[in-house]
Amino acid sequence: MRRLILLMATMALAILMASGVAQAIINGEPDGNMHPYVGALVTEVEGEDGQTEPVLLCSGTLISPTVFLTAGHCTEFLIQEDLPTYVSFDTTFVPGQSELVSGTPYLHPDYCVGCGPPGVKWLPGYDVGVVVLDEPVEMETYGTLPSANLVDTLQKRSPLTVVGYGANDFATGGGAQQPIYPDSRQMATTEYLGTQGIANQVGEDVFMKTTGSGMGQGGEGTCYGDSGGPLFLDDQTTVVAVTSFGPTSAIPCSGPDYAQRVDLQVVLEWVSSFL
C-alpha cells in the first residue's frame, strides 16, 4: 500500500490508475526461473519520512543484453517526472537489497493518451517503451520480437503466458479493497480473444484482447503492477504483446485484459532501432 500511495502522489500516474492502466498476476503461480529475462522496472521516490526509496513500478522483458521492453505509460511516467530508472531481474524484488541496473527510458513517438475513440479518450495508443541499460546483462536466453502481423494469424482461444511482478490478490474488509503486492515474478495462462473491442483506436487494431482473471471466479490474468510485462507464445520467448490496461469496474482486475501489440510494423521498427 505504501508503494501505491507514493506513486499515486503524482497526477500523471493517478490518472493512469484511475483509467485502469498499470496492470499484476491474479490466480497465477510463482515463475521461479521459468522466465529469468522478465524483470521489474524500478524507480526511486521520496517516502513519507523524506527519504528516497526504490519502488517497483512496472514489468518488462529483456530482449537483448541492453534493451528492456515495457509499456509506454511506464516510461512516459519516468520521463515526465525525470525519475531515475532501474531494472531488477531478481525473482522477488526487495527494496534496498535487490540488484539494480540503471538505464535510460524511451517512449514510442506515436504514443498518445487522449487520442482514443469517443468514450475511451484516455486510451494510450501505441503503449510501448524501452529502457536502454547502462551495463549489459548477460543471460543464456532473451525474449524475442515476433514476426510482423503474427497476431493476425492466431486462432481465438490460443493460449498465451503472461508474466509480471504485480498484485496477486486484494485485502478485503474495512473499506475499499487494497491490492496485495508480493513484488515477485509470477506467471499465468490466458487466452487470446481477438483485436476488436474497446481497446482499439478507430481503424487500428493496435491492441489485443485476452481473457482476464474474472476476479473471484478462478480465472487467471493481470492486475496493478503487471504493465509492460510480456504475453508469450508457447515457445515462452516470443513477446507478441505487452500488458497495457484493463477496463475499470467495481471489482478491480476482473478482466478482460488488453495488451499493446508488438507485432505491428511501426512498433517492430522502433524497438528494433535500439538493438
For the regions a language model picked out, list residue spans one by one.
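Chymotrypsin/trypsin-fold serine protease catalytic domain
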Residues: 124-128, 132-219, 257, 264-268
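Positively charged n-region of N-terminal signal peptides that target proteins for export
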Residues: 1-4
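N-terminal activation segment of mature serine protease catalytic domains
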Residues: 22-51
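A conserved glycine-rich beta-strand in the N-terminal activation segment of trypsin-fold
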Residues: 46-65, 123
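Conserved catalytic-core segment of clan PA serine endopeptidases
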Residues: 26-33, 52, 76, 81-139, ...
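C-terminal subregion of chymotrypsin/trypsin-like serine protease catalytic domains
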Residues: 31, 56-79, 83-89, 181-198, ...
